[in-house]
Regions:
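Internal catalytic-core helix/loop-beta-alpha segment
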Residues: 109-113, 117
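Conserved beta-strand segments that form the floor/walls of ligand-binding pockets within enzyme
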Residues: 3, 113, 134-137, 172, ...
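Short beta->alpha connector loops at strand-helix junctions that form conserved
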Residues: 89-91, 115, 136-139, 196-197
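Active-site/ligand-binding-proximal alpha/beta "capping" segment
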Residues: 139, 146-192
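Conserved N-terminal beta1-alpha1 strand-loop-helix module at the mouth
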Residues: 1-87, 93-95, 102, 110, ...
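Helix C-cap/helix->beta junction micro-motif
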Residues: 58, 106, 165-167
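Conserved dinucleotide-binding and phosphotransfer motif residues
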Residues: 81, 106, 188
Length: 214
C-alpha cells in the first residue's frame, strides 16, 4: 500500500481552492490536516472553521492530526466536521482508550501518534485498538524540517509487531518526506506518507506526488 497524504499546512492559503483542486486531480489519496494549539506544540494552525472549505473543495478523505492538549474535548467535533480519520498524540493523554472509543463511535478511523523522542514501544499495547499509528519523523509543530533517519528502524519495528499479530493497522509517517526518501520509507514498511513542502513547494506538485508513489 502506497498512500500519499499532502499536508494542507503547506498549501498557499491565498489560493486554497486552487491547491485543493490540484490535489483532487492528483494521485494523492488523503488530505492531511494538521491542527496545532500553540500549547502542545509552539505553533498555531487552524481549527473547525477551515474544515468546511477543506471538505467543500477537496474530494480526498480528510486525515486529521491533532497536535493539541486535551484532545478528548475536540475529537467528536472534528469527526462531525467531516474528518475521515482522527489522530492524537499518545504523550498528550493519560489514557488514550476512552478517546479512541469516542472517535470510533462516530464511525471515524482512529490513529495514535508519537513524536520522535517517544519510545516507539509505547505504541505496541494499542496496535489492536487503532486503525493507524503515525510516527513523526520530525518534531511536531513546523513544516520544512529535515527527516530524522532513525525513523526507518522504528518503522521496521512497528511493522514486525503489526505483522506478528496479523493486524491490518496502517503505519503513517509525517515529517521531512520527499521524492528522495519515499521509496525507502515504503520499503521499510510504511503504508502512508504525509508530504507538505515536497508537494506544495514542488515545481510540479502532481508529478511529485506520482513520483513518491512509485
Amino acid at each position: 500500500m502506497r498512500i500519499i497524504a499532502p499536508s494542507v499546512l503547506s498549501a498557499d492559503f491565498g489560493h486554497l481552492a486552487d491547491d485543493l483542486e490540484m490535489i483532487n486531480r492528483s494521485e494523492a489519496d488523503w488530505l492531511h490536516v494538521d491542527v496545532m494549539d500553540g500549547t502542545f506544540v509552539p505553533n498555531i494552525s487552524f481549527g473547525f472553521p477551515l474544515m468546511k472549505p477543506f471538505k467543500q473543495y477537496c474530494t480526498k478523505p480528510l486525515d486529521v492530526h491533532l497536535m493539541i492538549v486535551h484532545p478528548e474535548k475536540y475529537v467528536e467535533r472534528f469527526c462531525d466536521a467531516g474528518a475521515w480519520s482522527v489522530g492524537f498524540h499518545l504523550e498528550a493523554v493519560e489514557d488514550p482508550l476512552p478517546i479512541l472509543e469516542m472517535i470510533r463511535k462516530k464511525g471515524v478511523r482512529t490513529c495514535l501518534t508519537i513524536n520522535p523522542d517517544i519510545d516507539v514501544k509505547r505504541l505496541v499495547p494499542y496496535l489492536e485498538e487503532v486503525d493507524m499509528v503515525l510516527l513523526m519523523s520530525v518534531f511536531a509543530g513546523f513544516g520544512g524540517q529535515k527527516f530524522i533517519p532513525e525513523t526507518i528502524s522504528k518503522i521496521r519495528y512497528i511493522r514486525e509487531e503489526i505483522d506478528r499479530r496479523g493486524l491490518k493497522t496502517l503505519i503513517e509517517i509525517d515529517g521531512g518526506v520527499n521524492t528522495g526518501n519515499a521509496a525507502a520509507l515504503f520499503a521499510a514498511g510504511a503504508d502512508a506518507l504525509v508530504a507538505g513542502s515536497a508537494v506544495f513547494g514542488a515545481e510540479d506538485p502532481i508529478e511529485a506526488i506520482r513520483r513518491m508513489k512509485e
